[in-house]
């Protein structure tokens, strides 16, 4: 995921509206997904989460704490650059677990994107299995919890689920309103400026939702949610950037004007809400 946080000044310029928090989706979005989940799990699940995260020292990543659910939500990104004493990547094995590049211009098919289980949806299922099994080592259970919290957030960022052979939109240079730095791309817009605007809009997403609403949103399987996020990537993310046709040729730069931004921000917001309530379901199933 894009790791560069945008400044509050940049966000003001981008939106020409009210200021939004200055962290990109990889922090703010993930933390919000985690907070929604924590507000909606069963009391005994909260106890289990706290007990597991109290063992964060087992991860041996003091540079990347995971003692709270908010910290755990960004742990999987934080550890990406960590090296062993001889300079090798400690977590390189997990790089491909954050996404699944499923072509939005072809029929939905997870198989090529999830070869050998190296994709976000397969790892979500794996983490739930590890957490359910009390024979799993304490280290692996803590790590599985941190990965699970993060990966459910990743799955609900549409450009981690859909792709046009462009690295999940990273190759699509994008102007966000009047904010148009040379390196801004479609992925970073959905990670950062758009997510910040969407999440910051009132009312707060972090609250306990009615049981019927939780059940409705969390219905289905991880595979179902994968297809849904892929559909959002096709119908909204790429279509809004390419004049309505998600599979039309990509120009050197695309432009999201204010009307488009206002139309798609609620979609980004809803994906975060879905991610939080679905994470709550998985945590209850795995830990209660």
Predicted regions and their residues:
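Bacterial N-terminal signal peptides that target proteins for export
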Residues: 1-9
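Bacterial N-terminal signal peptides
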Residues: 8-16
């Amino acid at each position: 995921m894009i790791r560069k946080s945008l400044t509050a000044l940049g966000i003001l310029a981008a939106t020409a509206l009210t200021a939004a928090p200055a962290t990109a989706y990889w922090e703010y979005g993930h933390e919000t997904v985690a907070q929604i989940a924590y507000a909606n799990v069963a009391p005994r699940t909260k106890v289990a989460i706290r007990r597991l995260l109290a063992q964060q020292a087992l991860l041996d990543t003091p540079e990347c704490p995971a003692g709270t659910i908010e910290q755990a939500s960004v742990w999987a990104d934080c550890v990406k650059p960590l090296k062993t004493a001889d300079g090798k990547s400690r977590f390189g094995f997990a790089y491909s677990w954050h996404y699944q590049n499923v072509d939005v211009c072809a029929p939905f098919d997870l198989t090529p994107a999830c070869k050998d289980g190296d994709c976000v949806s397969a790892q979500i299922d794996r983490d739930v299995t590890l957490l359910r099994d009390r024979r799993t080592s304490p280290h692996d259970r803590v790590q599985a919890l941190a990965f699970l919290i993060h990966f459910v957030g990743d799955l609900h960022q549409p450009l981690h689920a859909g792709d046009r052979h462009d690295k999940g939109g990273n190759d699509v240079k994008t102007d966000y309103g009047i904010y148009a730095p040379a390196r801004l791309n479609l992925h970073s817009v959905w990670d950062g400026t758009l997510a910040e605007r969407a999440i910051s809009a009132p009312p707060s997403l972090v609250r306990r939702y009615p049981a019927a609403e939780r059940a409705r949103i969390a219905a289905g399987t991880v595979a179902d949610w994968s297809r849904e996020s892929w559909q959002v990537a096709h119908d909204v993310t790429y279509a809004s950037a390419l004049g309505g046709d998600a599979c039309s040729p990509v120009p050197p730069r695309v432009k999201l004007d204010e009307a488009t931004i206002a139309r798609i921000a609620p979609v980004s917001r809803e994906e975060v809400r879905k991610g939080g309530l679905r994470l709550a379901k998985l945590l209850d199933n795995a830990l209660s």
